[in-house]
A protein has these predicted regions:
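N-terminal "domain-start" segment that seeds a small globular fold
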Residues: 1-32
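Short loop/turn microsegments at loop-to-beta-strand junctions
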Residues: 16, 40, 120-121
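Flexible, glycine-rich phosphate/dinucleotide-binding loops
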Residues: 27, 50, 81
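Loop/turn elements at helix/coil->beta-strand transitions in domains of secreted/extracellular proteins
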Residues: 38-39, 68-71, 100-102
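Short active-site neighborhood of thiol/selenol oxidoreductases, capturing the structured segment around
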Residues: 30-55, 59, 72
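Short, internal strand/loop/helix patches
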Residues: 92-121
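Structural microenvironment flanking redox-active thiols in thiol-disulfide oxidoreductases
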Residues: 54-96
Length: 121
């Protein structure tokens, strides 16, 4: 695994619009569907990352504790040719296994990840 330093947009940054495939519902999900009266947590994750795997229980806890107070969305922008375990079916299967229901979106072109300056999971 290579060492890539994380970057993060400043808290309070205005939401960058997106419309991506939701691997949970198997429909597209638009940022317009988020409740504008609540803050949003946008996580860039992937199935195979050991750091993300380590935090599965924390992600579940955040969802359980805050699902009614904030919008929660996860986005994977990995290249599935290089990481087939990060494909939409595998994303759906992982969410089902973890018992999560918030959107897990697939950013196939990495356009949204680049817009959010996501460099690693």
């Amino acid at each position: 695994m290579s060492l890539t330093y994380s970057s993060m947009l400043e808290l309070g940054t205005e939401l960058i619009p997106f419309n991506l495939s939701n691997t949970v519902s198997k429909k597209h999900f638009s940022s317009d569907e988020l409740d504008n009266s609540k803050p949003s947590l946008i996580m860039f994750i992937c199935n195979h990352c050991p750091y993300v795997i380590h935090y599965h229980s924390e992600i579940k806890q955040i969802f359980h504790d805050y699902k009614d107070q904030i919008n929660i969305v996860a986005i994977s922008s990995n290249d599935i040719d290089n990481y087939p375990q990060d494909g939409p079916k595998e994303m759906h299967d992982l969410w089902e296994k973890l018992g999560l229901s918030f959107p897990y979106l697939f950013d196939e072109t990495q356009t949204i990840a680049k817009a959010y300056k996501a460099e690693c999971t």
